[in-house]
A protein has these predicted regions:
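Residue-level structural signal for beta-strand termini and adjacent loop
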Residues: 20, 69, 135-136
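Short, intrinsically disordered, mixed-charge
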Residues: 33-36, 73-78, 125
C-alpha cells in the first residue's frame, strides 16, 4: 500500500493490506530474540506440543500487533500515533498470512489537536480474526 497522508483518510472508509505473508518459524524465533521474550511456547516445539498441548509453536501477540502497526503507519505516517491497543483473540501459527484492516472514524479534537481513531482487525488466511484493536493518530483533517 502506498504511504498516505493522514488528511487523506476518509471517515467511514476501510483500508486493508497483507502485513505478514507465510509467517516462518525463523521469523518467530527472530522476534523472540529481538523482544527478549523467549517463552518456550514460541520457540520450543517439544514444550509447545507436549507441555502446552498446542499443535506447534505460535507467534507472540506483540508480533501480530507490530504487524498491524505497519498498516497504521502506512495510513498516518511515522510519529503520529497517540494510542495503540490490541486484544489477541487466537494464536498465529507458522505458515499464517495476516491481513490488517482499519476503519477510520470521524476526527475529534483532543487537547487542542485533531485526532482520528482507527478501529483495527487482523485476520488470517482462513478469514479468522486473530486480533482486534484501535489506534488514535494526529491528523490535520479528513477529506470526506
Amino acid at each position: 500500500m502506498p504511504a498516505r497522508h493522514p488528511e487523506a483518510l476518509v471517515a467511514g472508509s476501510e483500508y486493508a493490506t497483507v502485513v505478514v505473508e507465510n509467517l516462518s518459524r525463523a521469523q518467530i524465533v527472530q522476534y523472540a530474540g529481538v523482544s527478549g521474550d523467549c517463552s518456550p511456547q514460541h520457540v520450543d516445539e517439544v514444550y509447545a506440543t507436549r507441555v502446552g498441548g498446542y499443535p506447534t509453536v505460535f507467534a507472540h501477540g506483540m508480533l501480530t500487533m507490530g504487524a498491524a502497526g505497519r498498516l497504521v503507519t502506512d495510513l498516518v505516517g511515522d510519529g503520529r500515533i497517540v494510542t495503540f491497543g490490541m486484544r489477541f483473540l487466537r494464536q498465529v501459527w507458522p505458515g499464517d498470512t495476516l491481513t490488517a484492516r482499519a476503519r477510520a472514524e470521524e476526527p475529534e479534537t483532543d487537547r487542542g489537536r485533531q485526532v482520528v481513531r482507527l478501529t483495527l482487525a487482523v485476520v488470517n488466511q482462513h478469514g479468522e480474526q486473530v486480533a482486534s484493536g484501535y489506534t488514535t493518530a494526529l491528523v490535520d483533517g479528513l477529506v470526506g
